[in-house]
Amino acid sequence: MERQDRNQIIMLGTGYATATHCYNTCFILKTPDTMLLVDAGGGNGILNQLEEAKINLSDIHSFLFITHAHTDHILGVVWVVRMIASLIKSGKYNGTFTVYGHEKALKVLEWICRMTLPAKFTSLIGTSVLLHEVKDKDELSIGDIKLQCFDILSTKEKQFGFRALLPDGTTLACLGDEPYNENNKNYVENADWLLCEAFCLYKDRDIFKPYEKHHSTALEAGALADKLNVKNLLLYHTEDKSLATRKANYTGEAAQNFKGNIFVPYDLETINI
């Protein structure tokens, strides 16, 4: 992939867990010198998304962050590990590949890999493929990106988000795929960018039932962005029944509460940040 001088978010997928008309939510956070893959969706569709985005696996040099162990976020990671292990074995990948995640996410990933991948690949775990456990409040330097990790305090599944400081001073807060918890205010408030789930439109809440699934709506995401004084709001992890009108309708609903910039990307869309 050609070097870019701007920071970018490359949305590989934007859909919720059972989406069939778009890929599950995952993205690349890219600076001029670092490419961080955040989650990988629910299967080997991640390989197609990377190919469509013209990103070689060798471009994702060293870094992947898993928010949590749900199938639509972690199973694609197994495929990324498999393919990178193959590149390492064939001498086409230099250095190590590090997967960051909390204890449970890494435990699940390692178990699936060891139960399903050939020994020639799993033998690399711990040497060339490194599983780096992060804890609540940990601070990391991933390439030229500085991350502050935080437990989103989910009551459904242990999940971590992060606040990223990019080399030009831009700040980005990722809440994973569940609603904001007030205990994490310091990580999110005044961020330049907020990445937030919006399961559906508020007007469609009786159809998609976001609240019983620990999710929220575009209307509430807009209110959150306004409350936390962020500059730019990016919505993801949505239903996939309204893709033709999603960008306009989700933007319009979030804008009822938030006057900053709102982005509702399609799969494979790149946003300059």
Stretches found by the model and what they are:
Residues 2-53, 158-177:
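Conserved beta-strand hairpin/beta-sheet module of binuclear metal-dependent hydrolase folds
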Residues 9, 39, 50, 68, ...:
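Divalent metal-coordination and catalytic microenvironments
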Residues 17, 71, 99, 105-106, ...:
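Short histidine/acidic/glycine/proline-rich micro-motifs that form metal-
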Residues 19-21, 133-203:
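Active-site-proximal loop/helix segment associated with metal-binding centers of metalloenzymes
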Residues 37-41, 60-72, 102, 172-178, ...:
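Active-site neighborhood of phospho(di)ester-bond hydrolases with catalytic His/Asp-centered motifs
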Residues 44-98:
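Active-site metal-binding motif and surrounding structural segment of the metallo-beta-lactamase
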Residues 93-158, 167, 263, 267:
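Metallo-beta-lactamase
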Residues 180-269:
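Cap/insert and terminal regions of metallo-dependent hydrolase folds
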